[in-house]
Amino acid sequence: MVTKKPLVINQPAVGKLIRELRLLTGLTQEQFAATLGVTYPTINRWENGRSKPSPLAMEKIEAQLHEMGDPGTDLLHKYLAN
């Protein structure tokens, strides 16, 4: 069985990625938090660089990016390059 390595993006890029993903999906921080199973303050802390997502949260974020197709892939490449 092959295990997938979690996506690793450092701050501040991960906060920018999360904010841009959330805005692309048209969700508020509270709505986006619900899709990831976290609280609104958690999303706020991620976006503002005060904390970073857990590996499990990053897996969920990566899944959302892939589900978006080209826009999500483009966003992923944009922040992986930084």
Model-derived regions: residue spans:
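Short alpha-helical DNA-recognition segment
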Residues: 26-44
